[in-house]
């Protein structure tokens, strides 16, 4: 038998055996203790257990069917899918539209670049952050790309202020959502962005307290890319740096490790940062930085299979910016 096929069969069998639905009550009690969960009443606890049980069944099914990835009980396991998406993502239409970003059509076939590339290995990606219960993924993904742009240009990692974007971007709607290219446009409108230390994250909408004297990054120009080939993202990634992309996060909530091959694509609701790509056991994958904390996924990152539009990664035009 082919070694890769044998590996996947054994790996899949191991994953499928990891959880037993009949043990849901004991798993739930362990979950409550591990994540310090408290509910307002016994009826609420029962409701949360039923949601937990449903999520556990889905985790077991995913571990049996998606043999290149592993899924687990985590801090979101007592939330319905709709609750998780509404509280911990945040990609949405802005209040008004602007068109500052130049549209670039990438119609040439992909170049024959390296099989693997990862900006983290070059120390050009800041640490994983946690957006909490604020729908500001759009701000984190956009500023994550600017942080990497700054590191590439100045060989220095610096954390930028998502809170400034939340409070002072009057096109997007703060913790109630936004888009990637409009966030770039907002930074251009404001004249720049401050460091996180000067304008700390609060995970809430607040009054704008911007101080132009403390801007550390200024955006010269922004771009949106029309790509005919998903694989063209490799060229773009290597040339311009990490790229914010929009996805459907519905199928990544319980992710633990591995390469996601089966991922819903029913509507974009979350923004993440594309930082690299590679191949494992014959499966080409993208490496994406999430904003759910380093205790989620692969130390805050996840991988999806390339060239199948996993999680709708190709549905929205990717964007980037050029800094001064």
Curated annotation (Swiss-Prot):
PROSITE patterns hit by this protein: THIOL_PROTEASE_ASN, THIOL_PROTEASE_CYS, THIOL_PROTEASE_HIS
GO molecular function ontology, one term from the record: cysteine-type peptidase activity
Post-translational modification: Synthesized as an inactive proenzyme and activated by proteolytic removal of the inhibitory propeptide.
Active site: 137, 270, 290
SUPFAM superfamilies: Cysteine proteinases
Disulfide bonds: 134-175, 168-208, 263-311
Glycosylation sites: 159
Class of the enzyme per the UniProt entry, highest EC level: hydrolase
Domain of life from the UniProt record: Viruses
Family: Belongs to the peptidase C1 family.
Function noted in UniProt: Cysteine protease that plays an essential role in host liquefaction to facilitate horizontal transmission of the virus. May participate in the degradation of foreign protein expressed by the baculovirus system.
Protein name: Viral cathepsin
Source taxonomy: Viruses, Viruses incertae sedis, Naldaviricetes, Lefavirales, Baculoviridae
Underlying gene: VCATH
């Amino acid at each position: 038998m082919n070694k890769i096929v044998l590996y996947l069969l054994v790996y899949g069998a191991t994953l499928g055996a990891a959880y037993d639905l009949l043990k849901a009550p004991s798993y739930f009690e362990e979950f409550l203790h591990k994540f310090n969960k408290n509910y307002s009443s016994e009826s609420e606890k029962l409701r949360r257990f039923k949601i937990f049980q449903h999520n556990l069944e889905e985790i077991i099914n995913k571990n049996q069917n998606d043999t290149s990835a592993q899924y687990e009980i985590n801090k979101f396991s007592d939330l319905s899918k709709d609750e998780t998406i509404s509280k911990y993502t945040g990609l949405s239409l802005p209040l008004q539209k602007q068109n500052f970003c130049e549209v670039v059509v990438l119609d040439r076939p992909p170049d024959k670049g390296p099989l693997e590339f990862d900006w983290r290995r070059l120390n050009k990606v800041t640490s994983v952050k946690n957006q909490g219960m604020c729908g500001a993924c759009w701000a984190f993904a956009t500023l994550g790309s600017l942080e990497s742009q700054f590191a590439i240009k100045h060989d220095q990692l610096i954390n930028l202020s998502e809170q400034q974007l939340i409070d002072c971007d009057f096109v997007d709607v703060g913790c109630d959502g936004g888009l990637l290219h409009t966030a770039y446009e907002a930074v251009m409108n404001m004249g720049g962005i401050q460091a996180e230390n000067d304008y700390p994250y609060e995970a809430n909408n607040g009054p704008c307290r911007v101080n132009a004297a403390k801007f550390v990054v200024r955006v010269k120009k922004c771009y949106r890319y029309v790509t005919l080939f998903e694989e063209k993202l490799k060229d773009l990634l290597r040339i311009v740096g990490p790229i914010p992309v929009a996805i459907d996060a519905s199928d990544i909530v319980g992710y633990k490790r591995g390469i996601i091959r089966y991922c819903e694509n029913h509507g974009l609701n979350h923004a993440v940062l594309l930082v690299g790509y590679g191949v494992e056991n014959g499966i080409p994958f993208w490496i994406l930085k999430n904003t759910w904390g380093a205790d989620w996924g692969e130390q805050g990152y996840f991988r999806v299979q390339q060239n199948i539009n996993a999680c709708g990664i190709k549905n929205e035009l990717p964007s980037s910016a050029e800094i001064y």
